[in-house]
């Protein structure tokens, strides 16, 4: 390895390295924008164009395959820097008749010639989804492919749409509600009941008549309940609920009154201040 890459350094001031006889030169240096000679041309739209002609050699000599790596120029300040790398490697010995018909391909910088240059990185070709294929003889071809493959899918057939509709069909058992609302049926004497019980605001006349009826009868019979409801323009349920609430209210009053009476009895006349003053 060391004997093959044995490069003595000569003429160090000009940054030129001279190799042993029989090997190619490896040139590194800063080149100006006018003196930089490249094998490929740099197009203004940001793409790298192919060379116009391929190198040919005499039939008697072995074919030397070179790779050129051309980098875009970067302007910094007042000077322009560029790099031109020439790698000399892979000597091929071909017959004269093979050398005439052989097309020199353009090898990638990494030593593989399987990936062509694509215009997806910059320029208008990136939007169109195309590839530029470069060949050694200067030919340039544009390979196009559809932008969106999924946009050209065939539409859904009629049978498939019918199948989807059948799977999404709503059956009768799915329409049944789990908690059906309560419906108010007819009352005992033919008076229709209400669907939703709403708090009734009784008028003064209705409250007076109900209080009179409650004073005489705390519990009403069915016949009397219907008569009171018809006379007060109420239904049987409203009269029944009112009497239930009135009885509960009366019980609370009696209970509260009983507690007060019991407290008065427990205190007695001896504990009262008037009884103490009247005593001698």
Swiss-Prot record:
It is found in: Nucleus. Residues 261-280 have a biased composition (Basic and acidic residues). PANTHER family: HOMEOBOX PROTEIN HOX-B1, HOMEOBOX PROTEIN ROUGH-RELATED. This is Homeobox protein Hox-B1b. One of its GO terms (molecular function) is DNA-binding transcription factor activity, RNA polymerase II-specific. The gene is hoxb1b. CDD domains: homeodomain (cd00086). Its main location: nucleus.
């Amino acid at each position: 390895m060391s004997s093959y890459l044995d490069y003595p350094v000569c003429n160090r001031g000009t940054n030129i390295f001279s190799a042993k006889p029989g090997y190619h030169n490896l040139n590194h240096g800063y080149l100006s924008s006018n003196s930089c000679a490249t094998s490929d041309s740099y197009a203004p739209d940001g793409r790298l164009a192919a060379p116009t002609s391929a190198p040919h050699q005499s039939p008697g000599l072995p074919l030397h395959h070179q790779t050129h790596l051309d980098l875009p120029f970067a302007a910094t300040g007042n000077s322009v820097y560029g790099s031109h790398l020439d790698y000399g490697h892979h000597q091929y010995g071909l017959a004269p008749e093979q050398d005439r018909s052989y097309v020199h391909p353009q090898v990638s910088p990494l030593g593989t010639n399987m990936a062509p240059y694509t215009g997806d990185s910059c320029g208008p070709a990136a939007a169109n989804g195309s590839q530029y294929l470069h060949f050694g003889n200067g030919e340039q071809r544009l390979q196009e492919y559809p932008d969106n493959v999924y946009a050209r899918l065939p539409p859904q057939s009629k049978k498939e749409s019918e199948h989807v509709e059948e799977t999404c069909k709503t059956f009768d058992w799915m329409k049944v509600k789990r908690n059906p609302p309560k419906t108010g049926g007819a009352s005992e004497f033919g008076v229709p009941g209400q669907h939703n019980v709403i708090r009734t605001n009784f008028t003064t006349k209705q409250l007076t008549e109900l209080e009179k009826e409650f004073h005489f009868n705390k519990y009403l019979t069915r016949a009397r309940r219907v008569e009171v409801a018809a006379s007060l323009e109420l239904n049987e349920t409203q009269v029944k609920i009112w009497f239930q609430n009135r009885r509960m209210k009366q019980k609370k009053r009696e209970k509260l009154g009983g507690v007060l009476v019991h407290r008065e009895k427990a205190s007695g006349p001896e504990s009262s201040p008037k009884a103490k003053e009247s005593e001698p």
